């Protein structure tokens, strides 16, 4: 699977929420179908995301690149430490959850 292609497709056709605060909020409420976190995200943020995602039974995929690379992959001019997939749209991004 081409991660960049599927992420952009989810961004265009589905609902993707960027940012750690919103991602943690969605992890707490169970409002996401998949959470993606950058490898270099701050430890406190990663710990919170993994903890709440586990409680809500939401799969978490750790992006192998940095938050700068994740932001660039999404076509954003800023860093993205984490994001939540609320609706995958026409993408197959949820296949990452099975890895």
UniProtKB/Swiss-Prot annotation:
Keyword annotations from UniProtKB, A to Z: Ribonucleoprotein, Ribosomal protein
Entry's Gene Ontology molecular function annotations: RNA binding; structural constituent of ribosome
GO biological process: translation
SUPFAM superfamilies: L30e-like
Annotated Pfam families: Ribosomal_L7Ae
Keyword Ribonucleoprotein attached: yes
GO CC terms in record: cytosolic large ribosomal subunit
UniProt keyword annotation of Zinc present: no
Record-linked InterPro entries: Ribosomal_eL30, Ribosomal_eL30-like, Ribosomal_eL30-like_sf, Ribosomal_eL30_CS, Ribosomal_eL8/eL30/eS12/Gad45
Family the UniProt entry places it in: Belongs to the eukaryotic ribosomal protein eL30 family.
Name the record gives this protein: Large ribosomal subunit protein eL30
Organism: Pyrococcus abyssi (strain GE5 / Orsay)
Gene field: rpl30e
């Amino acid at each position: 699977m081409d991660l960049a292609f599927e992420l952009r497709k989810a961004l265009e056709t589905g609902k993707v929420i960027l940012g750690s605060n919103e991602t943690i909020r969605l992890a707490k409420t169970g409002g996401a179908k998949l959470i993606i976190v950058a490898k270099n995200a701050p430890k406190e943020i990663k710990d919170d995301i993994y903890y709440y995602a586990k409680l809500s039974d939401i799969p978490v995929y750790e992006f192998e690149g940095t938050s700068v690379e994740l932001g660039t992959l999404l076509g954003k001019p800023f860093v993205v430490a984490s994001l939540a997939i609320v609706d995958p749209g026409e993408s197959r991004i949820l296949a990452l959850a099975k890895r």
